[in-house]
Amino acid sequence: MELQTVVKLDKPSFRIDYSTRLMMLGSCFVENVGAKLEYFRFKTDINPCGIVYNPLSVADTLELLLAGKRFSQADLLRNGELWVSLSHHGRFSAREAGDCLQRINSRLEKSVAHLKTTNVLVITWGTAWVYRHRQLGRVVANCHKFPATDFERFRLSPEDIEQVYTDLLSRLHSRYPDMRVLFTVSPIRHWKDGAHANQLSKAVLLLAIDKLKQRLDYVSYFPSYEIVMDELRDYRFYTEDMLHISPQGIEYIWEKFQSL
């Protein structure tokens, strides 16, 4: 007797084993699975700019790595007592600009080197909603508690994402033709605008990935979102906020991921 709907895993054209070098970019879900990979001593580099949730900020991280970018003080903003980067998570912020730059540049340098030997790039998107800095005219990875009036918030379309990533991944593939890209959508729900808006956001991400899969033969998809929605359809697999996935849920998805 089947007591749950089981999500079928489409095997990608590659295998992940101890010879595989991985880079993982995106939401906190990437950090959860990445922590498992690191624990079992896989060669893994996770989020050189910290946690990023939307597709354009993940693309920005990749652009920084491809360009071998080194940040200067001109790339930072002052917010109260802290120097911050709009491309980075708050863990890179510091009271002194030099300390902030040291954290950013040393981490980027490590990841630039790792990318050159990466076999599998894992990208997890969490939301299609983005914040664009009005004065700078660019989408940010983190608002760093600047006033809400500094930003314009809007939802990307599948076409927006497809256009950016078709160009970006084509350039990446041209430089590293043996690299494979594995997309996932984070099952963590973004509840700010309610249930319906969260589903619309996830749908945008899923449609964009499907378009990229059809267009680029080195792109694959791992259904972490579907596994949680169908196989783990129970709040005991969530943390107390009822939005994030519990350790037990992460363990379940990790077991599925290992079968790739």
Show the residue positions of the predicted features.
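Extracellular glycan-modifying ectodomains
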Residues: 1-260
